[in-house]
């Protein structure tokens, strides 16, 4: 009772079992702890709400926080989220009934989806980033992944843009589906139960982005597509997945005996891809045509060992020019244990390893990049 309102949960649920006269009933109690904009309503959990504004715009400029309570689908509408907006999502398992078979099933509730001619435009600023996270602001939930599903840009959606944004505590960060388009600028995606960024036959451009504590892959690119990453840092410390996975395959059966192929083109400049395991880049090309997995890395720090063995992709480093293949002895970051992925000011291997990109003059913190020999990764060293 002595805590400020800002740390009160937005939604509280309690499941009660009531026994009376030999009967048993189950009751769900719900309470709301803060004044907020609940979408589609305070009673939207377990439901799907589609918003259509006939090609217009829906601007989330209310000073109150926004709570996605259920599944929110944007169609034929540009959802514009201005700087400083706080978006919380109430996740959890929901129950539904298949209309054909009549059988019930459970699914992960709580996500934002963009479909058809919908478009997501997030316009945060360095001083006032837009934050997507779970709806439990209490300190004990701060480091818990998988509390809501994530952001899903479905097939064919164009013009999606996310700038100066933090996405955390979800199952996935952002998924971009077939022929969908996304530009990321100054975005952080972390503390996810699955992959941070997923592209499936998609078009993604990212600059000055940071991915870490993603239990799956930090960056996962499947079934081809076009991808460009500049000054990005993707790490995978203490988890099983690699910092980067790239594939031109879509499995059509459980054992992937049946599959489809689509060309992948990926370009990385001034990026850092590292983690605790010896291999932080994973490749899969099921075609004998090497051009269907077309990738190049320039002025990047990577970490590979088994990937470049004769029975894998021994030619990888020839497409990584110039690159530094990191070892456990190499220092890059200031404090991995504290999730501080700024560069060590004394001995970071990323120091002055980059090449100038005229269109990107500042780092994720807003520091000016060296015009002649910038640092690799999303942060520039400040001496």
Model-derived features with residue positions:
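Feature for long, exposed domains in two main contexts
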Residues: 1-52, 56-60, 64, 72
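All-beta strand scaffolds that present successive hydrophobic residues in beta-strands
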Residues: 60, 79-81, 119-124, 159-163, ...
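Beta-solenoid repeat scaffold
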Residues: 60-61, 74-86, 92, 97-99, ...
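Right-handed parallel beta-helix
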Residues: 135-153, 157-214
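Predominantly extracellular beta-rich ligand-binding scaffolds that present long acidic/polar faces
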Residues: 208-342
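C-terminal accessory segments
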Residues: 323-383
């Amino acid at each position: 009772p002595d805590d400020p309102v800002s740390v009160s949960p937005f939604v509280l649920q309690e499941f009660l079992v009531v026994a009376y006269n030999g009967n048993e009933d189950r009751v769900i109690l719900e309470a709301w702890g803060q004044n907020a904009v609940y979408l589609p309503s305070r009673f939207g959990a377990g439901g799907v709400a589609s918003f259509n504004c006939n090609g217009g715009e829906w601007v989330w400029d209310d000073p109150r926080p926004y709570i996605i309570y259920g599944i929110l689908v944007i169609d034929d509408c540009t959802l514009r989220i201005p700087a400083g907006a706080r978006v919380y999502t109430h996740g959890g398992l929901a129950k539904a009934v298949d209309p054909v078979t009549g059988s019930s099933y459970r699914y992960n509730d709580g996500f934002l989806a963009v479909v058809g001619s919908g478009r997501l435009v997030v316009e945060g600023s360095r001083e006032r980033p837009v934050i997507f996270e779970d709806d439990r602001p209490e300190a004990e939930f701060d480091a818990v992944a998988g509390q809501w599903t994530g952001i899903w840009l479905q097939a064919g959606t164009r013009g999606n843009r996310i700038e100066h944004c933090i996405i955390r505590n979800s199952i996935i960060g952002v998924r971009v589906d077939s022929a969908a388009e996304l530009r990321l600028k100054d975005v952080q995606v972390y503390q996810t139960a699955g992959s941070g960024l997923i592209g499936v036959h998609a078009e993604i451009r990212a600059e000055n982005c940071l991915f870490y504590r993603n239990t799956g892959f930090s960056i996962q690119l499947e079934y081809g597509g076009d991808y460009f990453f500049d000054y990005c840092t993707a790490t995978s410390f203490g988890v099983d997945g690699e910092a980067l996975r790239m594939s031109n395959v879509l499995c059509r059966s459980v054992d992937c005996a049946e599959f489809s192929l689509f060309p992948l083109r990926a370009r990385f400049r001034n990026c850092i891809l590292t983690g605790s395991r010896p291999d932080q880049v994973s490749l899969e090309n099921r075609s004998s045509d090497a051009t269907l997995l077309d990738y190049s890395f320039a002025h990047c720090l990577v970490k590979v060992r088994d990937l470049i063995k004769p029975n894998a992709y021994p030619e990888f480093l020839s497409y990584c020019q110039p690159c530094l293949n990191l070892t456990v002895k190499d220092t890059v970051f200031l404090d991995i244990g504290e999730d501080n992925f700024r560069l060590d000011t004394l001995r970071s291997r990323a120091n002055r390893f980059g090449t100038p990109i005229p269109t990107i003059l500042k780092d994720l913190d807003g520091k000016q990049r060296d015009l002649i020999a910038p640092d690799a990764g999303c942060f520039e060293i400040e001496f």
